[in-house]
Design a protein with these regions (language model features):
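C-terminal catalytic histidine-bearing segment of alpha/beta-hydrolase fold enzymes
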Residues: 43, 183-187, 195-202, 206-249
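Primarily recognizes the serine-hydrolase "nucleophile elbow" in alpha/beta-hydrolase
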Residues: 115-169
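Short amphipathic alpha-helix adjacent to the substrate-entry channel of hydrolases
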Residues: 70-89
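Alpha/beta-hydrolase active-site loop
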Residues: 102-121
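Serine-hydrolase catalytic-loop signature spanning alpha/beta hydrolases and amidase-signature enzymes
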Residues: 63-66, 88, 116
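The feature captures the conserved acid-bearing segment of alpha/beta-hydrolase catalytic domains
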Residues: 156, 161-207
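Short beta-strand element of the alpha/beta-hydrolase
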Residues: 53-62
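N-terminal cap/lid segment of alpha/beta-hydrolase-fold proteins
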Residues: 20-50
Length: 249
């Protein structure tokens, strides 16, 4: 029962972040990136452009047990940047019970979504050399894993609500991996998304000399978002800088 309550609250938190505007319908819905699982699908929002566009790929949260790609339709990152020439994708992936409880298998499967996009980059007018990833909670773990444990050409990473599985992820973080901007909006009472997990990630990056910006709320031990600034806007600036720089600089 407690676990169910947590999952429900996790969805509420996720919804609290993404409900900023009207629903933005995708250009393509339910594109199958793999035949392995029913949930191996993604939605794609393509910016109107004569030149190949950069792409931000989102992975939803939900403790690997719930959640759906459709939650991204109201995200302010999408709402504010699609018309500015940035394309977006939102990915579904198998739940943990569909991979027999094997977290590693689930994480590795998510790489198929990026491979599908890069393989079809010309078809969708995507610049495969300018792909960044973002994700909430469980999705935060996925983004860091794809960027650092896999060689997928990801340019930058935006994990939100870095969760308690972070210690298992840290050995995969590498000095030549993509830079990270992490944001935990929870305070000290949230044991699932405790600020210490974002701090752990930041510390590991510092040890490796990897660029990492970490933000949180007042009293969390993390730097707060500058007054008048939106963290999604800061993340987009971070993405754009990575797209202009040499790989993983």
């Amino acid at each position: 029962m407690i676990q169910r309550i947590f999952l429900f609250l996790s969805l509420l938190l996720q919804a609290g972040q993404i409900c900023h505007g009207k629903i933005q319908d995708p250009t393509y819905s339910d594109l199958r990136y793999s035949g392995d699982y029913k949930r191996s699908q993604l939605d794609l929002w393509l910016a109107v452009s004569k030149k190949p566009t950069p792409l931000v790929v989102n992975f939803h949260g939900g403790g690997f047990k719930v959640g759906d790609k459709r939650s991204f339709q109201r995200n302010s990152m999408l709402q504010n940047n699609l018309a500015r020439g940035i394309s977006f994708a939102s990915v579904n992936y198998p739940y943990i019970d569909q991979v027999d409880g094997d977290h590693r298998k689930l994480l590795e499967h998510c790489a198929a979504s990026i491979k599908f996009i890069t393989k079809n980059a010309s078809k969708y007018n995507i610049d495969k050399n300018r792909i960044s990833v973002m994700g909430n909670s469980a999705g935060a773990l996925i983004t860091c894993f794809l960027g650092h444990a896999q060689d997928l050409g990801i340019r930058s990473i935006y994990p939100i609500q870095q969760p308690k599985g972070t210690p298992l992820l840290l050995p995969h973080i590498r000095a030549d991996g993509p830079p990270i901007i992490v944001y935990n909006r929870s305070g000290l009472n949230d044991q699932i998304h405790h600020p210490r997990f974002a701090i752990m990630l930041k510390k590991r990056c510092e040890e490796l000399g990897l660029n990492c910006l970490a933000y949180g709320v007042e009293g969390s031990g993390l730097r707060t978002v500058p007054k008048g600034k939106d963290v999604n806007d800061l993340a987009m600036q971070f993405f754009k800088k990575s797209w202009k720089s040499k790989k993983n600089e």
